[in-house]
């Protein structure tokens, strides 16, 4: 390694070591898991995508998103956020911080969660295109959401039930690949 590149590389390595496990994707290295935390950041439970599919009732939303065309709807399936949060025993908190795999953070008010019932979508309905591309086989009705489609977990809200003022002002509530739900006062 050349001497003029050694110092910047060492400085970066030291900065990452000092920042610790909360810096970058290393803090939550698996986008296929969701960690539920109390307000101090202590993990209460870790759920896999498979557990989100099998341990909670599934809700289906046929909805658009802030990024789809006005006439384009996608059918998503997954558990209600309020059902997942109730499992923590912290359902009475005022807010929930959602941390995404890319370190994006969104703050949700509990009244929003109760009023609009977002889901943590883990699947989307198979389409003709999915079948022709081999992403769905036989009578398969739903398939996993890919990273390119904002998965493997995507916080989906019933777009048509949201107040008009939420778009675009609250687009941050549609969290791509959330990995942590943290209680917040």
Regions found by a protein language model. Name each.
Residues 1-11:
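Bacterial N-terminal signal peptides that target proteins for export
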Residues 2-3, 19-24:
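N-terminal twin-arginine translocation
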Residues 9-20:
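Bacterial N-terminal signal peptides
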Residues 24-185:
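N-terminal intrinsically disordered, low-complexity segments enriched in P/E/S/T
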């Amino acid at each position: 390694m050349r001497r003029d590149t050694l110092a910047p590389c060492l400085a970066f390595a030291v900065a990452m070591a000092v920042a610790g496990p909360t810096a970058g994707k290393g803090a939550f290295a698996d986008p296929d898991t969701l960690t539920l935390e109390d307000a101090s950041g202590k993990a209460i439970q870790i759920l896999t995508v498979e557990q989100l599919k099998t341990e909670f009732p599934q809700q289906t939303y046929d909805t658009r998103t802030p990024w789809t065309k006005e006439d384009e709807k996608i059918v998503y399936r997954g558990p209600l956020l309020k059902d997942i949060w109730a499992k923590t025993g912290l359902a009475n908190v005022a807010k929930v911080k959602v941390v995404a795999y890319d370190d994006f953070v969104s703050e949700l008010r509990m009244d929003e969660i109760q009023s609009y019932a977002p889901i943590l979508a883990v699947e989307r309905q198979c389409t003709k295109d999915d079948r022709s591309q081999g992403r769905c086989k036989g009578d398969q009705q739903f398939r996993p959401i890919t990273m390119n489609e904002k998965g493997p977990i995507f916080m989906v809200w019933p777009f048509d039930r949201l107040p008009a003022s939420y778009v675009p002002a609250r687009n941050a509530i549609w969290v791509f690949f959330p990995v942590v739900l943290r209680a917040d006062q």
